[in-house]
A protein has these predicted regions:
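Retroelement reverse transcriptase polymerase core
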Residues: 1-168
């Protein structure tokens, strides 16, 4: 079962250009975890690399701040962005640093994987920059790959949803 999942992961990510073969002098091991639905998920074990990495301290939204922003809102829409971390490219030339080793060979990701310590902060920064104007208008908040649109009236809500979807 694990071999089948590994082969699927490698084939899909090689095909989509998210990874390529590597000759890196270092590599992280991989293992599988069982997800809630019983399926397996491949995990790159970047604990050693993450320990040595300078941490990006970009703040994530605090729940207490979110509650304050939602005051008075009556209409809510939650969107889940399906292109999250795996669409943020790693700086060219740095790919070798995050190589991972499998029984099928050594590979380098060309995009961020969730297990990299700065992935959440980097993705949050990107999302906040993309939606800067709409966040400033007070009609939405972003928490990683979750978007919450909130307004006081139905008319405002329809307009806000259109604005967010145009940006996406």
């Amino acid at each position: 079962m694990e071999q089948k999942e590994l082969d699927f992961f490698l084939e899909e990510n090689l095909h989509t250009g998210r990874i390529h073969p590597s000759k890196s002098p270092m590599a992280a091991p991989v293992f599988f975890i069982k997800k809630k639905d019983g399926s397996l998920q491949l995990v790159q074990d970047y604990r050693v690399l993450n320990f040595m990495t300078v941490k990006n301290k970009y703040p994530l939204l605090l729940i207490s701040e979110l509650v304050l922003q939602l005051r008075g809102a009556k209409y809510f829409t939650k969107l889940d962005v399906c292109w999250d971390f795996n669409n943020v490219h790693i700086k060219p030339g740095d790919e070798w640093k995050v190589a991972f080793q499998t029984n099928r060979g050594l590979f380098e990701p060309l995009v961020m994987f969730f297990e990299m310590t700065n992935s959440p902060a980097t993705f949050q920064t990107m999302m906040n920059n993309i939606f800067r104007d709409l966040i400033a208008e007070g009609i939405m908040v972003v928490y990683l790959d979750d978007i919450l649109i909130f307004t006081r009236t139905e008319e405002e809500h329809a307009k806000a949803i259109r604005q967010v979807l145009q940006v996406l």
